[in-house]
């Protein structure tokens, strides 16, 4: 009986520790998209999706923002607060906005979902390393004459969206292939098109407060 109580106490202590750690989470990759490809209901719809996933993970008390740019002048970097940001395991991925865009600690091991799980990367089946951003490497909106946001996140058919590689791995050693937020345009905006180029309609979520 005594050993049983000790085991239960240890289990509860471990659970409490894990919960406390998760309560500090301020960054994650969505574990699922809304299911309509790059049609996220605009950035507001994407923000709401972040909020729903965060609430399910026990951190819904924070204000969550999707790391997405919109044409012509909504910059992802300006939407996400000041940092620092930590993943579900308590690892700091960036100290502030400048750190995030100059020396981020984002890779397959740290770009975890709100559940604390790794996302499939290059070499995994299926590959899901394409993450929607619609952004330049500096986290800014792309030129308005180039629709790289699938109609500002309202299209699920023709079009294109800029994506990054959460695993920092691509076909070669170029800066683009290793970029977490600005690797290449998708071949379309539908769920199937995103899957066809190594994605699944996922995006980054940051706590803005």
Which stretches of residues belong to each language-model region?
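Short, linear, compositionally biased motifs with a strong N-terminal bias
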Residues: 10-13
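Bacterial N-terminal signal peptides that target proteins for export
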Residues: 1-8
């Amino acid at each position: 009986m005594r050993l049983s109580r000790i085991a239960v106490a240890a289990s509860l202590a471990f659970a409490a520790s894990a919960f406390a750690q998760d309560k500090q989470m301020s960054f994650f990759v969505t574990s699922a998209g809304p299911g309509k490809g790059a049609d996220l209901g605009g950035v507001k719809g994407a923000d709401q999706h972040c909020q729903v996933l965060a609430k399910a993970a026990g951190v819904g008390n924070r204000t969550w923002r999707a790391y997405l740019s919109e044409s012509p002048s909504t910059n992802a970097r300006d939407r996400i607060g000041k940092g620092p940001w930590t993943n579900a395991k308590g690892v700091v991925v960036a100290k502030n906005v400048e750190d995030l865009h100059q020396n981020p600690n984002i890779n397959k091991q740290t770009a975890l979902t709100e559940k604390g799980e790794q996302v499939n990367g290059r070499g995994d089946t299926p590959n899901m390393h394409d993450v929607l951003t619609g952004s330049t490497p500096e986290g800014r909106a792309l030129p308005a004459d180039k629709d790289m946001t699938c109609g500002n996140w309202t299209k699920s058919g023709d079009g294109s969206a800029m994506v990054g590689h959460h695993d920092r791995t691509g076909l070669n050693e170029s800066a683009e292939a290793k970029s977490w937020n600005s690797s290449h345009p998708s071949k379309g905006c539908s769920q199937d098109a995103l899957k066809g180029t190594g994605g699944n309609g996922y995006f980054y979520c940051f706590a803005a407060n």
